[in-house]
């Protein structure tokens, strides 16, 4: 859950729950990633919240919002963790009001 703003300082709420789709084709890389993920869960959560806070209500209300937001989260988390194993973001909950 995060605050989302619109021009004119109108405050909105975004409640979003995500799961990550990770490339599991290499068992060794996947196991290393799961360790990296566990060690950096706070940073990962913070990065996802930051991506959401950078969005406006108008951006989050568009039909392609989940696709664009998912791509941005994938890019930012892969950069944060110095990996390319995160391939997809799955939205369990996507509520903007």
Feature names for model-found ranges:
Residues 5-61, 71:
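Amphipathic, interface-forming alpha-helical segments with heptad-repeat character
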Residues 1-3:
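Generic short beta-strand segments
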Residues 54-97:
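Amphipathic, coiled-coil-like alpha-helical scaffolding segments used for oligomerization/assembly
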């Amino acid at each position: 859950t995060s605050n989302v703003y619109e021009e004119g300082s109108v405050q909105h709420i975004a409640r979003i729950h995500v799961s990550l789709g990770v490339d599991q084709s290499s068992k060794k890389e996947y196991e290393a990633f799961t360790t990296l993920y566990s060690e950096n869960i706070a940073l990962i959560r913070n990065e996802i919240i930051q991506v959401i806070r950078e969005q406006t209500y108008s951006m989050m209300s568009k039909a392609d919002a989940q696709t664009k937001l998912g791509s941005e989260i994938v890019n930012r988390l892969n950069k944060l963790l110095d990996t390319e194993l995160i391939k997809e973001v799955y939205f369990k909950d996507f509520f903007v009001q």
